[in-house]
Amino acid sequence: MDVNPTLLFLKVPAQNAISTTFPYTGDPPYSHGTGTGYTMDTVNRTHQYSERGRWTKNTETGAPQLNPIDGPLPEDNEPSGYAQTDCVLEAMAFLEESHPGIFENSCIETMEVVQQTRVDKLTQGRQTYDWTLNRNQPAATALANTIEVFRSNGLIANESGRLIDFLKDVMESMDRDEVEVTTHFQRKRRVRDNVTKKMVTQRTIGKKKHKLDKRSYLIRALTLNTMTKDAERGKLKRRAIATPGMQIRGFVYFVETLARSICEKLEQSGLPVGGNEKKAKLANVVRKMMTNSQDTEISFTITGDNTKWNENQNPRMFLAMITYITKNQPEWFRNILSIAPIMFSNKMARLGKGYMFESKSMKLRTQIPAEMLANIDLKYFNDSTKKKIEKIRPLLIDGTASLSPGMMMGMFNMLSTVLGVSILNLGQKRYTKTTYWWDGLQSSDDFALIVNAPNYAGIQAGVDRFYRTCKLLGINMSKKKSYINRTGTFEFTSFFYRYGFVANFSMELPSFGVSGVNESADMSIGVTVIKNNMINNDLGPATAQMALQLFIKDYRYTYRCHRGDTQIQTRRSFEIKKLWDQTRSKAGLLVSDGGPNLYNIRNLHIPEVCLKWELMDEDYQGRLCNPLNPFVSHKEIESVNNAVIMPAHGPAKNMEYDAVATTHSWVPKRNRSILNTSQRGVLEDEQMYQRCCNLFEKFFPSSSYRRPVGISSMVEAMVSRARIDARIDFESGRIKKEEFAEIMKICSTIEDLRRQK
């Protein structure tokens, strides 16, 4: 029988059906090929929005730069980046007036952070532009390479381990006339294999040093590498995102720390909180506006959308904001915070890999690297690409494009939120000095605006004034994409509000299912996702029970671990049946060993091993959780592990799940093909770090491991720890006098070696 899908909605209130309209089932779209075209679009668009600004040339790099600040007053409807400095400063002053001491206190908090942050903060984050190799690397490797190059160039402030000292090196490196870097390269030769007598390509890895002059070094230090944003749902076109190098990252981190501290104190800010906390914050603002509007006023809410938020923001404005926020603070603090926006005013966008060409006969493919775009004959390109290249050419230097205006995606989320909130703050009656007033919510580029007034004309006037105020600060509310409703129905950061928040369950759909970490983690993550959705997203008991059954089924098919008494034949079924037959208490077998599922919606919080422990045969317990069993992974099992799950929008979320170390928590081995590439040096570095860290963890088991607060190296910390432990063990009689003496001797030897180095 066919079911008419509209029948499903007859009894459902419209607002609860919202989640069915979201494009969140199935795989998200990924990008293929290079991001060069998208990056050129971004650069060209950004310049177009600021085109009536003033052109200048960077004296160090020769890059042409466009400065739209205090440019012509913006025109209606056209997105533009002509922010007015005095307006921004005034908005900041009013924000401070409504929140006395907010900037002062945030500065004090940030100063503490600045003095305590260690340089390993920069190892967080995934791909980072590595300026030494001129391509992307994992953050930890990029940082290590940077420090290695700094030290070989005599920049050693970073040895203290504090981030602020590393940044001193960055500052000094920019004054150097030349910087020497080591690059990895590959040599290929054809040789005859002795055994098979066939010709094979042999690859060897070489390292060579070369010098960058001041101009080349500055260009690299100011470069943001670009990539295509993957897995973006609900969009037809892809777009470019940026990843900055290590020189910029530390400075950005401190600016964002300050801005985060301010956002935490602002009731209109949707950052840095998330989830239920964010919903509570939003509900408060709505409640405030509704209670005040019950009798005499009407209240409307705009679900707002801004046109090209990043491309119209300007680092120079951020500099003005920081200058204001840090007034009366020590000089060193003001300087360190102003460097990030200054670097962003001089940034260069790397155009990525370039273009791929295929000949009509399909026999030949060739890549045109971005460096060649400046002077290649344009007859090979189609019209739209031709236009892009012509437009970007005056801005090109060494395959990077000068991009002074605009802020690439996701760099200053917190600080731009402060800017947005400062406009919402101006909606108080004491500032509007008329009958309408407004308030709202801001989270990076997303906003919701609530306007109250005695009549419709007042609402219109309020919205117009808000729109024009935004224009003066370089924010462009899109009249086409924003829509207005009676207060009580709006959407903000994909939360739908209808007299309270409606669970938008479709957004959680991608995180259901088997994650693919390993059998142990997947079981734990799967049930935790269901549990969390029962708590947060209106997942009802019947649906949750069904989700659980589907998950178990999915899990069994993924790991081919159907019940021991099933008829389904898989590669594992022979072994699993054997285990099933020789097990007395079959209920004690884990699902991944062909056991039955004992989960129901009441016990989702208990790890499966704990749930079944009492039911297990003794010898099964011994095999499953025996630390001497070579298959039990004890690499880094904490009682709580973190899984990265991908919700439908926003960044990947960290989700905690309980981890019990068993034979099922294996860690897969690295693919060997990397060993033959130029990445090999990187891999060797990584293994060296791994060994050092493992050694360090032996000295500081996790129970006693506190972040070292003093400024000492890992070696010093380990030596002093060894001495303390040896003394305790000697005095309690656990080790003999000779052993104690030997340990002390080794410690002294290590210290001598360090001094000689």
From Swiss-Prot:
Post-translational modification summary for this protein: Phosphorylated by host PRKCA.
Record-listed E.C. numbers: 2.7.7.48
Residue interval(s) of motif Nuclear localization signal: 187-195, 203-216
Sorted UniProt keywords: Eukaryotic host gene expression shutoff by virus, Eukaryotic host transcription shutoff by virus, Host cytoplasm, Host gene expression shutoff by virus, Host nucleus, Host-virus interaction, Inhibition of host RNA polymerase II by virus, Nucleotide-binding, Nucleotidyltransferase, Phosphoprotein, RNA-directed RNA polymerase, Transferase, Viral RNA replication, Viral transcription
Compartment list: Host nucleus; Host cytoplasm
Matches recorded under Pfam families: Flu_PB1
Region (Promoter-binding site): 249-256
Cross-referenced InterPro entries: RNA-dir_pol_NSvirus, RNA_pol_PB1_influenza
Catalytic activity: RNA(n) + a ribonucleoside 5'-triphosphate = RNA(n+1) + diphosphate
Alphabetical list of PROSITE patterns matching this protein: RDRP_SSRNA_NEG_SEG
UniProt entry tagged with the keyword Transferase: yes
MF annotations from Gene Ontology: nucleotide binding; RNA binding; RNA-directed RNA polymerase activity
A GO CC term assigned to this protein in UniProt: host cell cytoplasm
GO BP terms: DNA-templated transcription; symbiont-mediated suppression of host gene expression; symbiont-mediated suppression of host mRNA transcription via inhibition of RNA polymerase II activity; viral RNA genome replication; viral transcription
Residue ranges constituting the RdRp catalytic domain according to the UniProt record: 286-483
Enzyme class, UniProt record, top EC level: transferase
Function: RNA-dependent RNA polymerase which is responsible for replication and transcription of virus RNA segments. The transcription of viral mRNAs occurs by a unique mechanism called cap-snatching. 5' methylated caps of cellular mRNAs are cleaved after 10-13 nucleotides by PA. In turn, these short capped RNAs are used as primers by PB1 for transcription of viral mRNAs. During virus replication, PB1 initiates RNA synthesis and copy vRNA into complementary RNA (cRNA) which in turn serves as a template for the production of more vRNAs.
Quaternary assembly: Influenza RNA polymerase is composed of three subunits: PB1, PB2 and PA. Interacts (via N-terminus) with PA (via C-terminus). Interacts (via C-terminus) with PB2 (via N-terminus); this interaction is essential for transcription initiation. Interacts (via C-terminus) with human PKP2 (via N-terminus); the interaction competitively inhibits the interaction between the RNA polymerase subunits PB1 and PB2.
Family: Belongs to the influenza viruses polymerase PB1 family.
Protein name: RNA-directed RNA polymerase catalytic subunit
Organism this protein belongs to: Influenza A virus (strain A/USA:Texas/UR06-0195/2007 H1N1)
Name of the gene: PB1
